[in-house]
Swiss-Prot record:
This is 3-isopropylmalate dehydratase small subunit. SUPFAM superfamilies: LeuD/IlvD-like (SSF52016). Heterodimer of LeuC and LeuD. CDD domains: IPMI_Swivel. Belongs to the LeuD family. LeuD type 1 subfamily. It comes from Aliivibrio salmonicida (strain LFI1238) (Vibrio salmonicida (strain LFI1238)).
Length: 200
């Protein structure tokens, strides 16, 4: 995986709190275990008026022409609550979302997002309010996220955020659990060479 350092992108404002993983990717689309192909089902019950996903809901913000191509999702508190399905960050990533900004995230969803090289940025309610106002008032508004400096830049302002150093290291270097293990491949091979044959 390639690492994440900075990203500037169009923001889609989803002004709803407590969005759960069943809303993000409904259960009927969870048959696959690979990470691709879920983007078309993202927020299915909100984006579409029919079960087949052929009739877009014109009232849903992500269907608005001004937000097409958005790579940053702005939301309210407790985003990603509910079941622990990893398909939720898979669907967001497959749709094109690279960064999520909210006052808080459900713990398991937060970890799953980082494991999938997505950046969940926690800001205060007031800071999120300011970004909502900026995005909704300015068509084409973009926000910049700098993981190295741990800063969000919007409308001439900068907002600092925190992420623990280990997770930040993984994101900056594009490391998932396998990548972390492979960083120690030499030591693993050295240890394996010392194991008696009868234990192999």
């Amino acid at each position: 995986m390639s690492g994440f350092k900075q990203h500037t992108g169009l923001v889609v404002p989803l002004d709803t709190a407590n969005i759960d993983t069943d809303a993000i990717i409904p259960k009927q689309f969870l048959q696959k275990v690979n990470r691709t192909g879920f983007g078309k089902h993202l927020f299915h019950d909100w984006r579409f008026l029919d079960d087949a996903g052929q009739q877009p809901n014109p009232e849903f913000v992500m269907n608005a022409p001004r937000y097409q191509g958005a790579s940053i999702l702005l939301a309210r508190e407790n985003f990603g609550c509910g079941s622990s399905r990893e398909h939720a960050p898979w669907a967001l990533a497959d749709y094109g979302i690279q960064v999520m900004i909210a006052p808080s995230f459900a713990d398991i969803f937060y970890g799953n997002s980082i494991n999938n090289q997505m950046i969940p940025v926690r800001l205060t309610d007031i800071e999120v309010d300011e970004i909502f106002q900026f995005v909704e008032a300015n068509e084409g508004a973009e926000v910049a996220v700098d993981l190295e400096a741990m800063l969000v830049s919007a409308n001439g302002k900068q907002y600092s955020f925190e992420i623990d150093e280990f997770r930040r290291h993984c994101l900056l270097n594009g490391l998932d659990n396998i990548g972390l293990t492979l960083q120690h491949a030499d030591k693993i091979s050295e240890y394996e060479a010392k194991i008696p044959n009868f234990l192999k």
